[in-house]
Amino acid sequence: MARTENDTWDLASSVGATATMVAAARALATNADEPAIDDPFAAPLVRAVGVDFFTKLVDDNFDLTALDPEAAEGLTRFANGMAARTRFFDDFFLDAARAGVRQFVILASGLDARAYRLPWPAGSVVFEIDQPDVIEFKTKALADLGALPTTDRRAVAVDLRFDWPAALTEAGFDPAEPTAWIAEGLLGYLPPEAQDRLLDQIAELSAPGSRVAVEEIPAIEEEDHEEIAARMKDFSDRWRAHGFDLDFTELVFLGDRADVSSYLQGHGWKTTSMTSDELLVHNGLPRVDDDAQIGSVVYVTATR
């Protein structure tokens, strides 16, 4: 079903299902012969959501070789990409903590379990923002598992399209303190103008010493829209063939959008960036062939 202006979702539908898909990839990466990450909560959370296809993927008896070679290769690529992405944002938060930051915000937190698995320093506060149904589900699922946060975790149940800064402040966020923000797997699901608004809101809430890390899907030229849409459809068809029906072309916004690095630089931030291929190589993982990529993902880090 196509996106609408104020659409909502749970973790088994629409944009929410992509969070479950990514958690399944983290579980696969965690269980790899040479794991690049360790997320012990990924598989249990996927099982709690209960989407049959993803539950099978995280089963201890799942045999990747039982899939056709093309599907197995694609799944391995996806798990590697999510492992590298996870490491990037983990390292970003840990680097910020070592620099003295004690206030952390996860935008569109989905099934992110960093508040439960990272070694946070004393005095840290981690704010998780997502839609109410998503926040409620994950909080209960982790409680049912007996999991306890390793820091002061504060769940902020609000849609990022609404007045989330007010909800964040009400939860105890202090805009006078340096903050580390992450927007992981988020911007592509926002219209271009909503992306700009989100970056503006982050800037308004960021004291000197703050930093932000963003996964950016660069603007796709209009003449390339059909090709990218075709690749997304092919990706969706492959998932559908194995029992998961989600049309990615209906979830993302392909319109022209601001370059994140340039936008942040224009608002007083100093930025560095790394491509997805560079990130894979940095983590000792194989890069992706150009023909297998859907757009060029860039990981941006900014400080002020």
UniProtKB/Swiss-Prot annotation:
Pfam families named in the record: LCM
EC number: 2.1.1.-
GO biological process: methylation
Annotated InterPro entries: Ppm1/Ppm2/Tcmp (IPR007213), SAM-dependent_MTases_sf (IPR029063), SAM_mthyl_Trfase_ML2640-like (IPR011610)
Top-level enzyme category: transferase
Keyword Transcription included in the entry's annotation: no
GO molecular function list: methyltransferase activity
Domain of life: Bacteria
UniProt: S-adenosyl-L-methionine binding residues: 130, 159-160
Keywords: Methyltransferase, S-adenosyl-L-methionine, Transferase
Function noted in UniProt: Exhibits S-adenosyl-L-methionine-dependent methyltransferase activity.
The family this protein is said to belong to: Belongs to the UPF0677 family.
Protein's name in the database: Putative S-adenosyl-L-methionine-dependent methyltransferase MSMEG_1482/MSMEI_1446
Organism: Mycolicibacterium smegmatis (strain ATCC 700084 / mc(2)155) (Mycobacterium smegmatis)
Upper lineage: Bacteria, Bacillati, Actinomycetota, Actinomycetes, Mycobacteriales
